[in-house]
Every structure is written in structure tokens, then in C-alpha cells.
């Protein structure tokens, strides 16, 4: 009995001591954190105003569609955080906590960029933008996503199921928006906006990979949902995402290939199922090289970062 009590004391002491310094525990999560650090960028790196000239080149239905997408994307982070809460508080591993700090930091950049693009799409008319956003956040297609998420959070029986929801939000609920924005590039429109879309979609790929890693490797104390439950959630989320696209996509636009985007959404869902050890649900083919948002590995760096100056932007004064 004395030996057993001694072991318990040693374990408690170890936990207490580890709280005071960093100890590597999650190499896969640390790898993703380092990828995020290596690919940091700022909203000030991108001259969004350069794209203002292209707003007039969109047909009215196309302009309305992209205004709608960016209104959703701008609000999405807050909607997710309000419903899923602070999942990072569940973990003691510093690798996971440090990763989430990095993710929160880049999400701030995403929010600022989306706000700038939104304003640009309204010709920098802040009043018109505010009026539009106030009405569109109540749109049926957006409300369906939010209501579905709220209902599923209420139904959640474990933290593991919340991570499935996080994987679906980051990996499915943004997919059609990212692809639709990428199609602008094929017509040489909104070059800077498309560049920001590349960066943000890559960041979200890292975030989704992190959620998959945590689900696979760091939820040992939580009951995981049955495969039938996971498939049901994936099926519902994909259907909602496809309806989201179809509800607002311009009917006669030459900019978009709606069927290709829907196929991409289904492919993304199948890929994520594979990441958590399940067979595909849709058996959707991988997008061809011509698809403007063909699947990118999160390891890929771009010349954008190689061109950035490494000099400090301010003056450092040694006042010691």
C-alpha cells in the first residue's frame, strides 16, 4: 500500500512539475503548429483594394453571390466559437494548447481579410455593407447551417462527437465557398482576393488536419461516436453545403462549374473520412488538375512567403 501511494504521489508531482515548463508530447500536433508558424501571414500583406476595379465586371447575380459568400465567411468563425466553445481547455498537453494559440492568431487575420474583401465588394460603402450583412445573416441557407450545428451540439454525447462537428465545419462547410472564390482566378478576376483564398484555404486545411489528429490520437478518455453516427453527420453536412451553394449560385453564370464544386465537396468529405479511419461515403473522384482549388497538401509553401521582406518594420531601441 505504501508503494502504491508513493507511485501516486510521484505521478502527481510529475504533473505539477510539468506545468512549469514545456515538454514535447504530441509530435503530430507540433508538426502542424510549426507549419502554421512557417506560413504566417498578415492581412496587411495583401492589397485588397487592387481588386476594386473588378467589382464592376461581375454580373449583378454574380456580385450578389460573392457578397453572400463573404458575409457568411466573415460571420462563420464567431458562429462556430459560440456553438462549440473552447475545446482547447480540455487538454493539458502544451503542444495542443500552443497549437490552438497559433490557430486563433491566424483566424484573426482571416477575419480582417474577409472584412476588407466585403467592404471592397460594396465599393467601400460601409453603410451599404452593414445594411446587407444585417439582412443576410438571417438568410435561410446560413440559418440552416447554424441551426444544424446548434442541434447537433445539443445532441452530442461526447467531446469526440464535437470534434467530428469541428472537422465538418472546417473541412466541409467552407468547401463550396473556397472553390467558388477560386473560380474567379480562371477569368483573371480578383487576383488578390484569390491569393487570400489560397492562403486561407491552406490554413483551414491545417486546422482540419489538427482536428483529425486530436480525434485520432488524443481523445482516449472519451467515447467516440459509432461509424453509423459519423456517416449520418457527414451525409447531412454535405447535403447542407451543396444546398447552400445551389441556393445562391447564379443560374446562368459563365464563371462557375456548379457540378464540379459539388463533386469537390463530396470528395473533401470522403478524404476526411479516410483521415479518421473510415471508408468513403460518396466515392467522389479527386478533382482534375484543371479544378481551380485542386487539393493542396498543407506542406506546400508559396513564393508569396519567399518574396516577403525579413526586415523589422519598426525601429528597435536598446533602452537597457
From Swiss-Prot:
The UniProt transmembrane annotation reads: 164-184
Q: What is its EC number?
A: 1.17.4.1
Catalytic activity of the protein = a 2'-deoxyribonucleoside 5'-diphosphate + [thioredoxin]-disulfide + H2O = a ribonucleoside 5'-diphosphate + [thioredoxin]-dithiol
Localization of this protein = Host membrane
GO molecular-function terms, A-Z: metal ion binding; ribonucleoside-diphosphate reductase activity, thioredoxin disulfide as acceptor
Which residues of the sequence carry a binding annotation for Fe cation 1?
A: 77, 107, 110
Q: Which PROSITE patterns match?
A: RIBORED_SMALL (PS00368)
Q: Which residues form the active site?
A: 114
Q: Pfam families under this entry?
A: Ribonuc_red_sm (PF00268)
Q: Which keywords does the record carry? A: DNA replication, Host membrane, Iron, Membrane, Metal-binding, Oxidoreductase, Transmembrane, Transmembrane helix, Viral latency, Viral reactivation from latency
Q: In what way does this protein cross or attach to the membrane?
A: Single-pass membrane protein
Cofactors, names only: Fe cation
Recorded GO cellular component terms are:
host cell membrane; membrane
Positions contributing to Fe cation 2 binding: 107, 170, 204, 207
Q: Which GO terms describe its biological process?
A: deoxyribonucleotide biosynthetic process; DNA replication; release from viral latency
Q: State how it assembles.
A: Heterotetramer composed of a homodimer of the large subunit (R1) and a homodimer of the small subunit (R2). Larger multisubunit protein complex are also active, composed of (R1)n(R2)n.
Protein family per UniProt? Belongs to the ribonucleoside diphosphate reductase small chain family.
Protein's job? Ribonucleoside-diphosphate reductase holoenzyme provides the precursors necessary for viral DNA synthesis. Allows virus growth in non-dividing cells, as well as reactivation from latency in infected hosts. Catalyzes the biosynthesis of deoxyribonucleotides from the corresponding ribonucleotides.
Protein's name in the database: Ribonucleoside-diphosphate reductase small subunit
To which species is this protein native?
A: Equine herpesvirus 4 (strain 1942) (EHV-4)
Question: Which gene name belongs to this protein?
Answer: RIR2
